[in-house]
Amino acid sequence: MRTNFARLAMLAMALMLVLSACGSAPAATQAPAVATEAPAMTEAPAATAAPAATEVPAATAAPADSGMQIPEVVDGKTNVAMVLIGPHDDGGWSQAHYEGLLYVEKNVPNVHVTYIENVPEGADSEQVFRSLARKGFNVIFGTSFGYMDPMEAVAAEFPDSTFIHISGYKTNGTNFGNLFGAMEDMKYLAGMVAGSRAKTDGNPKLGYMATFPIPEELRLGNAFILGARKTCPDCTMDVRWINTWHDPIAEKDGAASLFDAGADVVLTGADTPAVADVAQEKGKWGITYDYIGSCKVERCLTTIYWNWGPIYTKVINAIVDGSYKPGFDYFDADSGSLGLFGFMDGQTMTKGTADLPAEDIKMVKDTLAQMLAGKFTRFDVFKGPIKDNKGNVVLAAGVSLEQLDLDQFKEWNPDVKIGMYWWAEGVTAELPKLSQ
């Protein structure tokens, strides 16, 4: 799930150590509150339980230039820090990463883990990354698109620390790597579910509540409508831009706007389950994102979720044994780190999904099985023939987008051949204006 926009927080910061109810969770440092917020397996990944109690080091004052306190490292251990854009218990993006960190604490030998939450993108985050590196953290994860440039800058200053950026598209090949997953796989499947629901309800209008106009959001929105039109060829999709990753009020307002404009099903690209709560109030349907536990109300069709623990464990173990090579690591559904709730092994479909036409459910399951087997990837999601919503041919029959097309806009990078600055056929919204 993230993009660099204007600072949204006050300069005052406070320290908070968060302890898990079933043990001692990673130490957490509280950054300023902000209104913001970047993977299938045969067995469904379950929400990760907190590890057995371990010692949590007390946080100490950060260097004067950071304006906040930074946790201490533990001598003799592999020290891992994670920087979160939102609160660790947001019910979405940040909570999925936090539970991945708990998995690491339980499964990586001799590791010390900690996290800092609510860190704004931009200059504030650069100070946090620099302070963590100065403290001596061996591995530092940054979990928002807008941390990309700050992490790149700090990585150049601290060659003995390894920086892993989630989402984005930059790497230095030495100590700054990139990690993300093809959530377009799952959003394509979620589109099939949404299209089937809309068709069954007799209302072929869908909605997508998008965050920021970055390639990730257009990629995921396009995957959703492409999937929807497999089960509902007449379906259309409206879009609302809320310009935040994490703001429950803005998310509720955006969802309500789409429902009030006629949408039967709305998918969110933001962090919290707000879209499902609004769907419950209005008797419509919502699809949540990021976290396996976010689909709780009756009017939630499904959620597309990440299972970060195994991926994080693999990366940290590789760093420790010296085999990690910083680069661009982009995984598909066969990694075991992406899920579609209700369709993975051992899971039960929601009420709103279970009564859909049998042929549509079969299409979703068959496509998912191909994804899990590695036979259907992100390049199959974006394989022609595909037209944009103006009737122009984006991809001829049999032609797929390349990775660079998925990651960037042609308007931002002249090396991109096609890019993602287009809406697929069926989208009724105009393209967003791009910031430079």
Task: Label the predicted regions.
Residues 1-9:
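Bacterial N-terminal signal peptides that target proteins for export
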Residues 26-27, 32-436:
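A residue-level marker of the well-folded mature domains of exported/periplasmic proteins
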Residues 16-21:
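C-terminal motif of bacterial Sec signal peptides marking the signal peptidase cleavage site
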